[in-house]
Amino acid sequence: MGLSDGEWQLVLNVWGKVEADIPSHGQEVLIRLFKGHPETLEKFDKFKHLKSEDEMKASEDLKKHGATVLTALGGILKKKGHHEAEIKPLAQSHATKHKIPVKYLELISESIIQVLQSKHPGDFGADAQGAMNKALELFRNDMAAKYKELGFQG
């Protein structure tokens, strides 16, 4: 289910826009995730107390974590599917320490797509959206495979 060179180019083009302001993109992705799927907030001890969007926007920790998430994802996307070395430790920590189910990876992928649509409509047309969806699905499938190897049923 790999992506063509052209699809990877579409993914990386829009990702360049994300990298121009990783903290605000990451913050918006997490806020959308937590507002749309409040159950995901329970996995984050640091953020459980944040109930309103205003509280989330004011949280430097949330902004920092959003930047961490998108920086890691950017490193994976730049590998164009050759991301075994990046996926392994990420799956290890998300399966054994954080216990993040694959379903939550789907939910954050949806939030990423929504943020890209909102912030970069001119650079994120149907072709770019399709390519990004494929890239995120590849990431999730590889995370799920590692989870399985680790015996995590998430």
From Swiss-Prot:
Modified residues (Phosphoserine): S4
Domain of life, per lineage: Eukaryota
Transmembrane segments: none
Binding residues for nitrite: H65
Classification via SUPFAM superfamilies: Globin-like (SSF46458)
EC numbers: 1.7.-.-, 1.11.1.-
Compartments where located: Cytoplasm, Sarcoplasm
Keyword list, A-Z: Cytoplasm, Heme, Iron, Metal-binding, Muscle protein, Oxidoreductase, Oxygen transport, Phosphoprotein, Transport
Ranges of residues in domain Globin: 2-148
Biological process per Gene Ontology, one example term: removal of superoxide radicals
Positions bearing Phosphothreonine: T68
Annotated positions binding heme b: H94
GO cellular component: extracellular exosome; sarcoplasm
General function of this protein: Monomeric heme protein which primary function is to store oxygen and facilitate its diffusion within muscle tissues. Reversibly binds oxygen through a pentacoordinated heme iron and enables its timely and efficient release as needed during periods of heightened demand. Depending on the oxidative conditions of tissues and cells, and in addition to its ability to bind oxygen, it also has a nitrite reductase activity whereby it regulates the production of bioactive nitric oxide.
Family membership noted in the UniProt record: Belongs to the globin family.
Subunit (UniProt): Monomeric.
Name recorded for this polypeptide: Myoglobin
